[in-house]
Curated annotation (Swiss-Prot):
The gene is rplI. It comes from the Bacteria. This is Large ribosomal subunit protein bL9. Binds to the 23S rRNA. Keywords: Ribonucleoprotein, Ribosomal protein, RNA-binding, rRNA-binding. Disulfide bonds: none annotated. It comes from Aliarcobacter butzleri (strain RM4018) (Arcobacter butzleri). It holds the Pfam family Ribosomal_L9_N.
Amino acid sequence: MKVLLIKDVKSLGKAGEIKEVADGYGKNFLIGKGLALHATTDVLNKHKAEQKKLALKEEQEIAQAKELAEKLNATKLTIKHKVGANGHLIGSVTNKEVSDALEQQFSIMIDKKNIALDNKIKTIGIYEVDCKLGHSIHAKLKIDVIAE
């Protein structure tokens, strides 16, 4: 009997694969436990339609991420920070500050976890920060840190 795996099954295959299995194993274990569906033409057509939807959605997400990357590469973010007597910042610029400033100045929302500050920003100047946008797409954001 042919089954369409709904979930990953150890030693058999991954979700979405079609496998030929013994009737008893397919009916009693795989279908009985909700790990697979009987691979009828109806089920296979629905599965293909879902796969097309997922592929289309992923293409749209990639296009949006690329568009956002272009926007961020051309953006220069300005962050005002308190400065001490010696010209160094009081504290340092954090991922959260960068994320909040992006949202306030450009209405771009990026999670602070996706902003990679290699070294802490502790002095006034212009810095480049890597932003992870998903689907292996990255953008370089320029940050201008100025005195408050």
